[in-house]
Amino acid sequence: MQGLAGSVRVAALDIDGTLTERRGAARLDGCSIAVARLLNDLGVTSILMTGNSLPVARGVAVYLGLEGPVVAENGCVAVVGGERVHICSGRPPEGLVKRIMELGFKPSWQNEYRYHEYSLIPVKAAPGIVERASAIAEEEGYRAIWSGYALHIQPPGGGKARGVGEVLARIGAGWSEVLAIGDGENDVEVLARAGYSGAPGDAAEQAKRAAKIVARSPGARGTLEIIQRVLGGARAPAC
């Protein structure tokens, strides 16, 4: 999989665990800047795909210097060419959210800025808590997605693959032209569909199995490693 710079038009990148220092960390790695500059230098369109709220995702894109589309809330909302696109409709009902919170979750501060998803943080680790939350959500026709950082409750019709697919259609690109990199269970569908895909070295096992390349390094350093490998050893700024 060497020397494919001409075949890759789009890089779809997760944020947390992919541009941060490692999986579970919230601090951006200095290598994330090198990733952004390398993609810009190569003329590859970036798509940030994240479970974060849209303001957070757009803020990360702006400060990294990535001018491509943004997919937020695990595919429920996107910004393409300055236009906000809603892929999901509505929000989970308060009663459902309350039932799931009673398992041992608390609200994320980002919920105030979300259009469709509701995000919950585990109060403490408890075996089977995510599986029980998913079962409750499914009973009422909703999805509960674990990102490695939070539990995301979303209406039907979401998912990162759905959001990225909507963006690709709008920019005239196909899945075969995409290099996707992600570390979480919520990235698996995109990793499986993309023509080229990778996971940082400390990614979730589901992501590693779905990816075509698994980096040696964690977090953003692993992401940079994957990009350089797929794009023929392209040189990146030091980080």
UniProtKB/Swiss-Prot annotation:
Residues annotated to bind substrate: K160
Catalyzed reactions per annotation: 2-phosphoglycolate + H2O = glycolate + phosphate
Top-rank EC class of the record's enzyme: hydrolase
Matches recorded under InterPro entries: HAD-like_sf (IPR036412), HAD_sf (IPR023214), PGPase (IPR006382)
Gene Ontology CC: one annotated term: cytosol
Domain of life, source organism: Archaea
SUPFAM superfamilies: HAD-like
GO molecular-function term, one example from the UniProt record: magnesium ion binding
Family: Belongs to the archaeal SPP-like hydrolase family.
Keyword vocabulary terms for this entry: Carbohydrate metabolism, Hydrolase, Magnesium, Metal-binding
Protein name (record): Phosphoglycolate phosphatase
Residues where Mg(2+) binds: D14, D16, D183, D187
Coiled-coil blocks: none
EC number assigned by the record: 3.1.3.18
